Regions:
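Nucleotidyltransferase catalytic core that binds NTPs
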Residues: 1-81
Length: 81
């Protein structure tokens, strides 16, 4: 079965082979895959710009992948309680 749209999200802090494998598998099952990169300027270990470039460069040969940025403004997990 081929889906019209798929979504795979994460902080990718850092991007690793498990993420890459799952994104490739998801993209092969979708006409369009949105990879949602969540980031927080307060908590991230690796700057969002680096992680964005890693994802972009890792999948630039796959035309059906689009990267979306999603900022998380909470300072820590207790802000969600």
């Amino acid at each position: 079965m081929r889906y019209k749209v798929g979504m795979y999200g994460g902080a990718f802090d850092p991007l690793h082979i498990g993420h890459i494998d799952l994104i490739i598998k998801a993209a092969s099952q979708c006409e369009k895959l949105y990879v949602v990169l969540s980031y927080s300027r307060n908590r991230d270990n690796i700057p969002m710009e680096y992680r964005y470039r890693w994802i972009r460069n890792s999948f630039k040969h796959m035309d059906n992948i689009e990267i979306i940025l999603l900022e998380d403004n909470a300072y820590n997990k207790s802000d969600y309680d």
